[in-house]
Regions:
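Alpha-helical transmembrane segments of multi-pass membrane proteins predominantly involved
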Residues: 1-351
Length: 351
């Protein structure tokens, strides 16, 4: 498939989405937060359907639009409930008026968490991710896997640990459930995938589960471990998609796992890069991905949340299977026709 995305709208949409995320992250008010969220989402709807001549891209954009609109409605309803219970939309004023025994406001928190869980594709609000990742241009998929997730996780931290830190007993188990479900489902669902972008979609769901595990603890160590994890995950994703964008032959991109067959024989440097990246994503020491998971598990075990740690370890073992399967295809399967080597300098530098 030939991806014709070099149009003037493309950078404008990317910048509009980033602007919305910056507004969302820096907001101290529910209304401003919602406006930033919608500015981000409107740009992402168009980016998802940028290859409008292809059925998969149009389907992905429509599915993302419908489900995102539903989640935004639930999130706005949660904001209205919180305003109704507290009389304010300012985070600081909300925090000053709350007590730890105000259970009624939990309904508002739940609705907002549902909306945010959709944005980071946490289970069970992940339905859009595989189709959108596969149907979007590869560079847009890279954007989806990195920037919106960082913004949404930052909002998770600001939202839960500023106005609602006193209500940790009400929202902690919600995050624990989202974390466990995401880690297990993402790891298991990725096993049967043949498309690299769908595999990364399910893999990202699993990785978000680890980041949520850090946030669910309710301590500074948990927040720090979550931030470290998502930072390392972003770097690994950038490297993986750089390799994916280099899989081009005669102006056509290839994105199936079988297209990596025997890659080491024709492209040894790219194969070595993928080896390091996939080992790191699998959490194999002494690479960065291992330390990312180590800090998460350390913070979880220190708070005696042993079941969460056991589920995380089990998910890591399951996920290692499909990462190692890709490495086996790269190094031990028969080689295919060589890919182009005239890549942009920026792509080579990012790798």
């Amino acid at each position: 498939r030939i991806f014709k995305i070099f149009k003037i709208e493309y950078p404008i949409l990317i910048l509009s989405s980033v602007l919305g995320m910056m507004v969302m992250i820096s907001s101290n008010d529910l209304i401003v937060f919602y406006m930033g969220l919608e500015l981000q989402s409107l740009a992402l709807y168009v980016l998802a359907t940028f290859n409008r001549d292809q059925l998969k891209s149009s389907e992905a954009g429509l599915k993302y639009f419908v489900l995102s609109a539903l989640s935004s409605g639930l999130l706005l309803y949660g904001c209205s409930l919180i305003y109704g219970f507290t009389g304010s939309t300012n985070f600081d004023l909300i925090a000053n008026q709350l007590n730890s025994d105000e259970y009624a406001i939990t309904f508002g928190i739940v609705f907002i968490l549902v909306g945010l869980a959709f944005k980071i594709s946490a289970v069970p609000f992940h339905m859009w991710a595989p189709d959108v990742y596969e149907g979007s241009p590869t560079s847009v998929t890279l954007f989806f896997t990195m920037v919106p997730k960082v913004a949404a996780l930052t909002v998770f931290i600001r939202f839960l640990y500023v106005p609602f830190v006193n209500l940790i007993d009400q929202w902690q188990m919600i995050l624990v459930f989202l974390s466990i479900a995401s880690m297990l489902f993402g790891a298991i669902a990725a096993i049967g995938q043949t498309n690299l972008k769908r595999l990364i979609a399910y893999s990202s769901i699993s990785h978000i589960g680890y980041a949520l595990a850090g946030l669910a603890i309710g301590t500074n160590d948990g927040i720090q471990s979550s931030v470290i994890y998502i930072t390392i995950y972003i770097i690994m994703n950038l490297g993986f998609f750089s390799c994916l964008l280099m899989m081009k032959r005669n102006n056509e991109y290839y994105e199936d796992i079988d297209d990596l067959s025997g890659l080491s024989k024709n492209h040894p440097l790219m194969s070595l890069s993928l080896l390091v990246i996939l080992f790191s994503l699998a959490g194999i020491p002494p690479l960065a991905g291992f330390f990312a998971k180590f800090y998460i598990f350390k913070a979880v075990i220190e708070q005696s949340m042993y079941f969460l740690a056991i589920v995380g370890l089990l998910s890591t073992v399951i996920a290692a299977f499909y990462y190692l399967r890709i490495i086996k295809i790269i190094y031990f399967d028969p080689e295919k026709e060589k890919y182009d080597t005239d890549h942009p300098v920026g792509l080579k530098l990012s790798l």
